[in-house]
């Protein structure tokens, strides 16, 4: 199924790109989320009429993400206190929700879906560099320190 993208989508394309996707992906994700429309002559003409508005909206979202990234890079360190054993092994783990809550408490609102932990949850005391993915083009790193209570 050929669709016109109304938003930048990772691993698929940018605003205004005409791409071929599977029907289920279009029907179940792209169309309900408002991220794409079917590639017909009428929709193509309507998109070209709205192109400037959509590009301005996309630029505003990018600027907001860059502003949040600047706030996050201003944070020197985020500390999370949790229960740990004698050797520094945590009772439990520190995951994306814990990190997002700690960063939000430090003054910058972050959703748990924006916190990226490719190596999995943190299970020991120490300092970690955590990637925060704010936009498809904006990533920043936050230093998180896990300490024992």
Swiss-Prot record:
Disulfide bonds: none
Keyword hit for RNA-binding: yes
Any Pfam family the entry gives: Ribosomal_L9_C
Domain of life of the organism encoding this protein: Bacteria
Keywords: Ribonucleoprotein, Ribosomal protein, RNA-binding, rRNA-binding
Any one GO molecular function term: rRNA binding
Record-level GO BP terms: translation
Cellular component terms per the entry's GO annotation: ribonucleoprotein complex; ribosome
Function: Binds to the 23S rRNA.
Family, per entry: Belongs to the bacterial ribosomal protein bL9 family.
Name of the molecule in the record: Large ribosomal subunit protein bL9
Organism the protein comes from: Tolumonas auensis (strain DSM 9187 / NBRC 110442 / TA 4)
């Amino acid at each position: 199924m050929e669709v016109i993208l109304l938003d930048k989508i990772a691993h698929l394309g940018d605003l205004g790109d005409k791409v071929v996707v599977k029907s289920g992906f279009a029907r179940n994700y792209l169309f309900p989320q408002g991220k794409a429309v079917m590639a017909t002559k009428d929709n193509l003409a309507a998109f070209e009429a709205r192109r400037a508005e959509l590009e301005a909206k996309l630029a505003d979202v990018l600027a907001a993400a860059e502003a949040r990234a600047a706030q996050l890079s201003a944070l020197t360190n985020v500390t999370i206190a949790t229960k740990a054993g004698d050797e520094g092994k945590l009772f439990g783990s520190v995951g994306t929700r814990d990190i997002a809550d700690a960063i939000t408490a430090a003054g910058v609102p972050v959703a748990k879906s924006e916190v990226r932990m490719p190596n999995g949850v943190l299970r020991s005391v120490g300092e970690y560099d955590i990637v925060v993915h704010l936009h498809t083009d904006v990533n920043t790193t936050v230093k998180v320190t896990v300490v024992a209570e």
